[in-house]
Amino acid sequence: MREWVLLHYRVPSVPSARRVYVWRNLKQLGAMLLHDSVWVLPYTAWTYEQLQWLAAEVEELEGEAALWRAQLILPGQEEALVARFVAASEAEYAPLRDAMAAEEPDLADVSRRFLQVRRRDYFDCATGKEIYGILSAAREE
């Protein structure tokens, strides 16, 4: 069974910049929205630390935040959640595959974007490995 870290938060609706700030940070981490304001990431020391910092920022923004470590118990739930994370990573990698198929791909740009997506690819999806191989081969040419 995997462990997960969950963040539940609430920030004042006005000004909306506070909510947008928190949302952008969660998206940048690759967190998945479970329900309303409950977000989840696979538990690692790094994801836990990032959500601790974000929870502290929520409180500085005059909001409330709660952070949990949890396990999914019912059959199939964990697999479904992992599948959501993998699908999100696959969707982020797709434009990189397209960029590498161009006549003269911008390797620096694709590499930079690859590293950004790779940081959110918590389950090492197949497309990420494929893009890495394509980038490695292109650099050797």
Model feature map: region roles:
Residues 1-100, 119, 135-138:
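Positively charged, polar, low-complexity stretches
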Residues 113-141:
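Glycine-rich, aromatic-bearing surface loops/beta-hairpins
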